[in-house]
Amino acid sequence: KIDSVSFPDSLKKIKRHAFEDCEYLKDIDFGNGIEVIGLHKSRIYDSSVFNGCSSLKHVTFPKQIKEIGRMAFKDSGLEKVELNEGLKLIGEAAFAYCKIKALRIPASVYDVDYMAFAGVDYVVFENESMTTSAAFALITEQIGTVHVTAGNKSIYIMSPTMKECLDGSVRTMDDMKRFAEEKAITMAEFLIKKDDSNGFKKMLEINDYCYDTLKSILDNIQIDNAVCMAYLMDEIEKKREAEDEFSM
């Protein structure tokens, strides 16, 4: 039973399937030599270096790590991940379907692959130019929501709709915010059916919808949840007052 592993400074790369399904593994010390964890761009082979390590809860990547390969930590027990400044590439499904609530992507990262963060609740991209990669990385077939921040802009959106951002029309966070406006009714319906008043409030606050979008939600959805209705009416009133003030 392997419950911890330490890598010597002389080792530069961890190869495919090295610790796949090591269910007792809890601690990893990458040392000062490891730069590459598995394969990044291969469409033929997955890396699965720590795939399925269900007891692994927390990983801190040291400063020399440059690449995290395809499916490297997929389906592991990870709850907290600290990515290093200097990291450049994150492969397909690298952290997909873990238990990570929030993840910060350093500005040094310039390439993030398909479904890399599928299932993560909140992702912060320090590099705002990573918007297209953000959509690509957050695609998932699981029905859920995701909060994305890039630079000083944020959106809150349904994860499966991210694939619709890949037609070339979404290149900036402003484009993504417009996309969030277009999907407002779909997302509002989803949250109301779940009876998720906190999620509904979060959607309204983060996406900061315009008056017309808020009115469209009111006119097109049956809202039986009194709390959600109160949140919506409050936002509509705020936008109405702001528009009245602007027109004076």
Which residues fall in each region the model found?
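Ankyrin repeat structural motif
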Residues: 197-204, 226-234
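Alpha-helical DNA-recognition elements
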Residues: 238
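Structural signature of tandem-repeat unit edges
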Residues: 1-13, 23-43, 51-67, 76-89, ...
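Terminal, non-catalytic domain-edge segments
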Residues: 241-242
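Ankyrin-repeat helical register
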Residues: 191, 220-221
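Non-Sec secretion/translocation targeting segments of pathogen effectors
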Residues: 246-248
